[in-house]
């Protein structure tokens, strides 16, 4: 029987919380071209976010062994 593999890109982007109920991820748009973005916008982008219920199902399908 073949082993089901984790999708590596999903492993790198999402981290499971300690309670195993949520997946944490970093918001995009904070790598380059930061001069035109306001300080408030950059500060809000630094905060980690949690995946929605719909995304959680997709993430769990991509991570069978997590």
From Swiss-Prot:
InterPro entries: Ribosomal_bL35, Ribosomal_bL35-like, Ribosomal_bL35_CS, Ribosomal_bL35_sf. The keyword Ribonucleoprotein applies. One of its GO terms (biological process) is translation. One of its GO terms (molecular function) is structural constituent of ribosome. It holds the Pfam family Ribosomal_L35p. One of its GO terms (cellular component) is ribonucleoprotein complex. The keyword Membrane does not apply. Keywords: Ribonucleoprotein, Ribosomal protein. Belongs to the bacterial ribosomal protein bL35 family. NCBIfam families: rpmI_bact. This is Large ribosomal subunit protein bL35. It comes from Wigglesworthia glossinidia brevipalpis. The lineage of its organism: Bacteria, Pseudomonadati, Pseudomonadota, Gammaproteobacteria, Enterobacterales.
